[in-house]
Amino acid sequence: MPTSVLDSFALIAYFRGEPAGAPVKELLQKASKADKPVHMTEANYAEVKYMIVRKDGAETWREAAKILIALPIEFHPATRELAEVAADFKSRVSFSLADAFAAALAKEKKAELVTGDPEFKAVEKEIKINWLK
């Protein structure tokens, strides 16, 4: 199982039961069985929260947060080193700062980035992307 980094798109699709969330569910199940967590930045966590609260409401977020605790996801803070790489991405690519942190973490970990967000096409030559549909 390759090392994987989740973008906000992936986790939101998972929580909303969207078709793109099915491979995320499978990935999380494999990660749990292998005792090998997937990775996500705290910046992406914040993006997931505000997007769910904004569109689906605070109660939906509270339920999602309870589920999130049990998922095999290791959250990474925005260290200075990670911020440097994220800033380099953000200076060149028109995507959110949280997306820049996801790309930076994937680069740092030499991991695949799991996303369906087309804005990442701009960096697919620099990092491996597992495209969700």
Question: Which residues does each predicted region cover?
Answer:
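Short, well-structured N-terminal submotif of metal-dependent ribonuclease cores
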Residues: 1-40, 53-66
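Active-site neighborhoods of divalent-metal-dependent phosphate/nucleic-acid chemistry enzymes
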Residues: 74-112
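Histidine- and aromatic-rich ligand-binding microenvironments
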Residues: 6-7, 40-42, 94-96, 117, ...
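Acidic, PIN/NYN-like endoribonuclease modules and their adjacent C-terminal/linker elements
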Residues: 1-3, 103-133
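Helix-loop "lid/cap" segments that line or gate small-molecule binding pockets
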Residues: 48-54, 72
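Anion (oxyanion) recognition and catalysis
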Residues: 32, 69, 107
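A generic structural signal for short hydrophobic patches within well-formed alpha-helices
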Residues: 11-12, 45, 120-121
